[in-house]
Amino acid sequence: MRSKALCGLMSVWVLLVTVPLWAHHSPSAIFDMTKQISVTGTLTKVDWINPHIVILMDAKGEGGKVENWKFESNPPSWYRRVGVTRADFAKAIGQTITVGGVRARNGTLFGYLLMIKMPDGTQLDLVVGDIK
């Protein structure tokens, strides 16, 4: 009987530990995956860090006001596997890029990157499927 109780407690513990981990690794926890956006602007900074690369860009919003956007992306290892390096992003700083992604649920100028079009016209799709 004691081993059944211990097994039950361990099962509950595993569920309690793994559910938050799953939520952390799910973009839909932070981003509204149904609200795709496209932003064109100037790439200002790239944080080439784990666990996710972050790009910062300035884009003109309503009324011509400059908005400071932040997009989270895949990890550096993913980019290396597809042949994109930190230097590729460094060359693009100060130039115009277009990104497609999904916006944060809280409505801030924060998104999850699904596509990036570099200044030379090269487009990199970070997901499989239809990106609007």
What positions do the PLM features span?
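Short nucleic-acid-contacting surface segments enriched for D/E, G, S/T with interspersed K/R
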Residues: 81-99
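Short, basic/aromatic beta-hairpin or loop at an interaction surface
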Residues: 65-78
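Bacterial N-terminal signal peptides
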Residues: 7-20
